Amino acid sequence: MHKNMREMEQYSDDQFVVKGVYKGTRSEAVLLFLKPGQEMPPHPHERFEVTLVPHKGRGTMTVNDTKEVELVPETLYYEPAGSTFRIRNTGDGPLQVLITLVRVGE
């Protein structure tokens, strides 16, 4: 399977957009699209390890309401299961992030 990320690109003036890339038995991948100023609110990933790879734009990720990380293109970010995070587009242009989630345990 392969998908062209450019062809999947989609933004909304109302809120962030999440598009599924694939879903397996223990893992899945999504693309997150945010216009400047938009954010994905804090949400937990109790049973998933999360890897993020920004492809376009700049933003911040707040982890567990304590750590703020700058998101920059072509950098890999990993958060263990149980983390809660928020993503915000702080740049002047669109932010696009590939997110993979891997289920841990049963």
Which residues are covered by each model-predicted region?
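Glycine- and acidic-residue-biased ligand/ion/polar-headgroup-sensing regions
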Residues: 48-59, 64
